[in-house]
Design a protein with these regions (language model features):
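Short hydrophobic/aromatic segments of transmembrane alpha-helices and their interfaces
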Residues: 1-2, 10-11, 26, 93-95, ...
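Basic/aromatic-enriched alpha-helical hairpins
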Residues: 13-38, 68-75
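Conserved catalytic core of the tyrosine transesterase superfamily
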Residues: 17, 45-51, 57-262, 269-317
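General structural concept
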Residues: 29-54
Length: 317
């Protein structure tokens, strides 16, 4: 196989997926002591040994990795055997678990965090602490764009300045060449509206102005001296950053929030403010109702903080 073919094959698979599958194969071979190619009996015993220890979704991911390995190597896929499917069904029956969901971030909490960040930005500016001013200005833009667009963490990390068209006072046009929901890799453009308050567009303008960035990743690391990294956020850096923000703003249970809290919170706000399911799915980019309902069900439609005056669906869509 030529290097150019390998290059394109590597690009066809998301890095996170590749790493998780490699870890799953390593667990099967090294930690459990399995052999590849595997038999249906071996896969069943592997599942049975970890059925009460690992989350069901983790087991499904391990099975998917084993299936891919066999398919790529040209061997029969043992994970499709009826016995494997029955063992999985038995594990789900005997070890039921409620899926842990990130807490939805609500409008009142967004306001609380933004107020905190604005105060910290002002203090940093007055004390001429450029690194701190940079960091908090970046965080404000990340928070507001992430919430009002219902972006996942990986979408925030993929945003590139050259793919964003800024119209001051009106909005942003953000093109993502690829995302988790874009199976055909056709790319998609997302509109981000300018708002009267908690404005993501103004926050983005402020971030570009203070950072001086004109290309590359929108959101990057900043060291203690105020040097901005050339690379975007690492895959594991976003959740700790958000939790530090939530803790700094005084939110309780900060560890229960994650990058999914932005999308979950937006879905709850939109539902409480009269968006129908079709409008919400089109805006966020969900392709199936099941995916959307996982976010909507987590919201409390009677929560007062969701019912604060805010932009209408027509304003955002």
């Amino acid at each position: 196989m030529t290097s150019s073919v390998e290059h394109y094959l590597s690009a066809a698979e998301r890095p996170n997926t590749r790493r998780s599958y490699e870890s799953a194969i390593r667990h099967f071979e090294v930690e459990w002591g399995g052999f590849l190619p595997a038999t249906a009996d071996a896969v069943s015993r592997y599942l049975a040994d970890y059925g009460g220890q690992l989350a069901f979704n983790t087991l499904k991911q391990r099975i998917a990795a084993l299936a891919q390995w066999h398919q790529e190597q040209g061997f029969p896929d043992p994970t499709k055997a009826p016995v494997v499917r029955k063992v999985l069904k038995g594990i789900r029956t005997l070890h039921p678990a409620v899926a842990k969901q990130a807490l939805p971030l609500q409008i009142s909490q967004i306001e609380q965090i933004v107020t905190c960040l604005d105060n910290l930005i002002l203090q940093a500016r007055q004390s001429q602490n450029h690194a701190t001013e940079l960091r908090h200005t970046r965080d404000k833009a990340l928070l507001l764009i992430g919430f009002w667009r219902g972006f996942r963490g990986d979408e925030l990390k993929r945003l590139q300045i050259e793919y964003i068209q800024l119209t001051p006072g009106q909005g942003l046009q953000c093109f993502l060449p690829q995302s988790k929901s874009d199976r055909q890799l056709q790319g998609r453009t997302f509109r981000v509206p300018a708002l009267a308050r908690l404005c993501p567009v103004a926050a983005y303008e402020d971030w570009l102005a203070i950072s001086g960035l004109s290309s590359g990743p929108v959101f990057r690391g900043i060291d203690r001296w105020g040097s901005i990294s050339a690379n975007g956020f690492h895959q594991n850096s976003l959740i700790p950053l958000l939790r530090r923000l939530f803790t700094c703003a005084g939110l309780s249970m900060a560890d229960e929030f994650s990058s999914h809290s932005l999308r979950r919170g937006f879905a709850g706000w939109a539902t409480a403010n009269g968006w129908d399911l079709k409008t919400l799915m089109e805006y966020v980019g969900w392709k199936d109702v099941k995916s959307a309902m996982r976010y909507i069900d987590a919201s409390d439609p009677f929560s007062p903080s969701l019912l604060l005056a805010a932009p209408s669906p027509d304003k955002l869509a």
